[in-house]
């Protein structure tokens, strides 16, 4: 990622630790959103990454993680960016697209979250007054456990 902006991480789950395939999915989705934010955001405004968990009735070993990446843009680019994001989120894609071109950007996040969660969890919440675009996705991820000194398995997962 070519970083131009300061990135601020916040939220109740920002220090939580996870393991398993969910970490790779999380990384891929977050990478796309941060890369796009750095590319299109105003250089004088920080990019905000808010990380929270939602109540999860499925398993105590899984967190339902919700990540929102918010960036500000200039008024001459805002409405075009908002429209392009909306079109990409609403567009349907054929599975053959993944084979022939590989997904990138919003298509990649939609594919990853749909494969993991059963449907795409990507959404955009624009704030026209502040010229902010907030993109959110949710994933279930396995909570990392740390084993005690007495345990047979001394690994720590981060």
Name the predicted role of every residue range.
Residues 2-15:
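Conserved transmitter core of two-component histidine kinases
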Residues 5-7, 61-67, 131:
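Short beta-strand element(s) in the Bergerat
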Residues 15-23:
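Conserved catalytic segment of the transmitter module in two-component histidine kinases
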Residues 22-52, 110-112:
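Conserved ATP-binding N-box helix of the HATPase_c
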Residues 56-108, 146-148:
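Glycine-rich/acidic phosphate-handling loop/turn and adjacent ATP-lid/helix
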Residues 106-121:
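Conserved glycine-/histidine-rich ATP-lid loop and adjacent helix of the Bergerat-fold HATPase_c
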Residues 120-128:
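Short hydrophobic beta-strand elements within the C-terminal catalytic ATPase subdomain
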Residues 127-158:
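C-terminal end segment of the histidine kinase catalytic
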